[in-house]
UniProtKB/Swiss-Prot annotation:
Species of origin: Mus musculus
The enzyme's E.C. designation: 1.7.1.7
Keyword Cell division: no
Annotated SMART domains: IMPDH
Residues at which GMP binds: 219-221, 242-243, 268-270, 286-290
Binding positions for NADP(+) per the UniProt entry: 26-27, 78, 129-131, 180-181, 269, 285-286, 314-317
N6-acetyllysine carried by residues: 291
Protein name listed in UniProt: GMP reductase 2
Pfam families with a match to the protein in the record: IMPDH
Function in brief: Catalyzes the irreversible NADPH-dependent deamination of GMP to IMP. It functions in the conversion of nucleobase, nucleoside and nucleotide derivatives of G to A nucleotides, and in maintaining the intracellular balance of A and G nucleotides. Plays a role in modulating cellular differentiation.
Residue numbers annotated as active site: 186, 188
Amino acid sequence: MPHIDNDVKLDFKDVLLRPKRSTLKSRSEVELTRSFSFRNSKQMYSGIPVIAANMDTVGTFEMARVLCKFSLFTAIHKHYSIHQWQEFASQNPDCLECLAASSGSGSADFEQLEQILEAIPQVKYICLDVANGYSEHFVEFVKDVRKRFPQHTIMAGNVVTGEMVEELILSGADIIKVGIGPGSVCTTRKKTGVGYPQLSAVMECADAAHGLKGHIISDGGCSCPGDVAKAFGAGADFVMLGGMLAGHSESGGELIERDGKKYKLFYGMSSEMAMKKYSGGVAEYRASEGKIVEVPFKGDVEHTIRDILGGIRSTCTYVGAAKLKELSRRTTFIRVTQQVNPIFSNSQ
């Protein structure tokens, strides 16, 4: 029988962080590096826990080279060949600890994943990515991958509720990707009516994961550095970005010139374009759940990274968190009806 959950669920746009007394004199005093020990792999992580999404327009080797310099992480998309992986690994050995090899749950994807991890043993992270992390098939797949790679750290998703976070962690995953439908080029909510407001999903899933000594990634829904800070404040251990990293020199996607202006194509991995590119088209039994956009060309991604990290540091100073680790403990969200003054909203 249908049921309505009357609890209010919130998104990033519905809240602001309340400022609090601080002893910090400067943003430069804020430490953004986090260290984690993972539940199932027993591996250690140290870095700034912002991840480039495993989309072919974002999770590129070019992106990984730059993000690695800032101690950020990249989930490399699954469409690189083993030869491309080997070439990148030989030229960029220092980056290999800051990236994950991605896979879907199909047998061909898994075979390629095995080849990559056997050829490049320095890669210690696996990103298992499906649109619907609630299927029994996916849970069994996570168990199989854990059995095959007992010492690799496994990211798995996507889900939005605590009980599924717990099931995936108990099945062998270390870090659960949280988010269904919040992405800038995702149309799942429009096509299916399924989803969950991202802020509430992160808070509830973080609580479930941390109770089992697991971790979560807030995946999708960030449109500005303030949203990234809110995700960390809500309890996310990592934040994954797609649209915010699209449109750069290091991003994938075709470069288009029109009327003297440059654009880069950015599209969801369930869009018609992605399915034509990798699957020969949209299967007759399914619908496209992603859109295609032309992002104004932004140049090198380094400037955007500095802007994001600067915003997070500033958040920490406003709430009195000397370390990113302390941000969630210093967070009080207030519900709002308006985020910003809209008078010059069309100006850069």
